[in-house]
Amino acid sequence: MNFPLFIARRIYGRNDEKRRVSAPAVRIATAGVAIGLAVMIISVCVILGFKHTIRDKVVGFGSHIQVADFMTLQTSEQYPIQMGDSMLNELKRTQGVKHVQRFAMTQGILKTDNDFLGVAFKGIAEEYDTTFIHQNMIEGSIPKFSDKKSGNKILISKTIADQLKLHTGEKVFAYFLSHNNVRPRRFTIAGIYQTNLSQYDKVTCFTDLYTAVRLNSWEEDQASGAEITVEDFDRVDETESIFINKVNRTIDKYGETYSSKTIKELNPSIFQWLDMLDVNVWIILALMIAVAGVTMISGLLIIILERTNMIGVLKALGANNTTIRHTFLWFATFMIGRGLIYGNILGVGIIALQKYTGIFKLDPTIYYVSTVPVEFNFPLILCLNIATLIICLIVLIVPSFLISHIHPVKSIRYE
């Protein structure tokens, strides 16, 4: 029989009304662990959800990697690059690549009777993965975009629609400047999307690849570039290095040079900001572990002092300091365990409530999302539980040495 464990279970399970000091101390220590763990779970799940939601929105507008003309990736101007079947097949055969799609960008002005707005038209074709657009559609539908003909239909954001007072099904004129000539086009608004990523929502419209290429006066096999989706975002740099060796610095038949950049290189400020959130998480984890540790230390010291008489009796019966220390560490383990159970119920419960109801709202103009995004990561939650238990027990080792300073004769007479 494990003697320290047996004694600890008897002490912990005993309902002793005389222990007016230790009972509240146990409850406070348990609550400290529970609240600390709950805050850690909520913080980690919210930060993970926020990072992945914002990342997915940025990736939705530009995929993981872009292969384009060298000058296009270095400046704000659009330079054409050949994107024929041979190059597309070459990109698709690259290890780690999941999907390849062409795109062409052009600038224009949307004009109504009362207002006008400069926007960026993104031309896309049949192979374009519209999953991201579907997820963010709020009105209308996505037309069948083509690289063979113009459907004269566009998708606009809610931001643009509100500013120009446009609705689905209405027609709007767009004006494009080409070779010092103004080229008007009339489009039908097929649908309206909203991502809350303001830097894109303010300017981005979707139309046919054919339309964008023609408006830029490019050849049929030219485009702004290709967007590549990789199988594993964590290995995007590794996949891009293959393009650097395989595609970059090669020249197409028009004399243009291929180059590539990852979405992190194209949007460094956003991804640096997201990386900084990890620092906030570590600060929160450290603070909550400290709170749990302090409450456990104070709780254990109170229990040891109140059980001085019992410690003296155990020593008189032959129990050594190590055995008694182990007894109180087991007692602390029970307190921590109960705190972990309550903390998991509270933390996971709040996260589940937010995930399925979206009860906690945010200002999308500031945070890019309308509700607090959360993401369950059960392996990480398990690691938080284990780490909390281990760290709390480690910090309790030093206070437990107080037992070695308790003298049996004096402590037996202590009441």
Where are the language model's segments positioned?
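Membrane-interface junction motifs in transport/secretion proteins
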Residues: 51-85
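Short cytosolic juxtamembrane segments of multi-pass membrane proteins
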Residues: 401-415
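Hydrophobic alpha-helical transmembrane segments of multi-pass inner-membrane transport and secretion
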Residues: 21-48, 275-310, 333-342, 390-394
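A short beta-strand structural signal in non-transmembrane regions
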Residues: 65, 160, 221-244, 259
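Short helix-loop junctions at transmembrane helix boundaries
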Residues: 338-384, 397-401, 405
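Peri-transmembrane interface segments
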Residues: 16-27, 239-242, 246-291, 303-305
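A structural signal for hydrophobic secondary-structure junctions
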Residues: 81-221
